[in-house]
Amino acid sequence: MHIMEGFLPPLWCLIYYIICIPFIVYGIMQIRKVTAESDEAMPMLALSGAFMFILSSLKMPSVTGSCSHPCGNGFGAVFFGPAVVGVLSVIVLVFQAVILAHGGITTLGANVLSMGIIGPLCGYAVWLGLRKLNVNDEIAMFFTAFVADLMTYVVTAIELSLAFPKPDFFTALVTFLGIFAVTQIPLAIAEGILTMVIYRFIKQQKPDILVKLRVISKEEAGVN
């Protein structure tokens, strides 16, 4: 999903930077809030960021000027909300652009918008919806990660189609989505399973963390 350096026209790069700014500012405020409220927040923030960095570094080349890979953005969204993931994604994407030549600085706004804002936001909406329907938290985590991953690529396809609407936007969008779908649907399923397994491990070993971060209730965690 990382759009490479210099691939987008400068105007679109600027637009995406501007769109991201208020989300990142709000995310920083949320990080200050959650770290002040709970001592467990900082290590979980680090884990969420590391999870995103590792998964999104496992890239497969794509002919779209982007690439395919897991995203790891649904995991942090469940623990801290999508705004915090936006801030984590900035850190992850800057490191990947500078150290791994994965993505770019000019395209940072576009990549943050897809992987750090809209993808996690959609995944978090799925989490809230499924939990209101009393769906098991582990199953809900699977679908959260699955949707966050896929929506990241839907947004990337939209960004590419807006920049290169040939012969028109909708035709370009169908083309980009079709190319991404071949690799991304299996990757999203695999990411959903991996995220669910890691979540289950945390729930079994440190259920109190999930309670303190208001992810699940004491009854679900089995703690007093």
Swiss-Prot record:
- Return the PANTHER family for the record: COBALT TRANSPORT PROTEIN CBIM, PTHR43627
Q: What is this protein called?
A: Putative cobalt transport protein CbiM
InterPro entries according to UniProt: CbiM, CbiM/NikMN
Recorded GO molecular functions are:
cobalt ion transmembrane transporter activity
Segments passing through the bilayer: 8-28, 41-61, 75-95, 108-128, 138-158, 169-189
Species lineage: Archaea, Methanobacteriati, Methanobacteriota, Methanomada group, Methanobacteria
Q: How does it assemble?
A: Forms an energy-coupling factor (ECF) transporter complex composed of an ATP-binding protein (A component, CbiO), a transmembrane protein (T component, CbiQ) and 2 possible substrate-capture proteins (S components, CbiM and CbiN) of unknown stoichimetry.
Domain of life per record:
Archaea
Q: What does the record give as its pathway?
A: Cofactor biosynthesis; adenosylcobalamin biosynthesis
Q: Which UniProt keywords apply?
A: Cell membrane, Cobalamin biosynthesis, Cobalt, Cobalt transport, Ion transport, Membrane, Transmembrane, Transmembrane helix, Transport
- UniProt key word Protein biosynthesis: no
**Which gene carries the instructions for this protein?**
cbiM
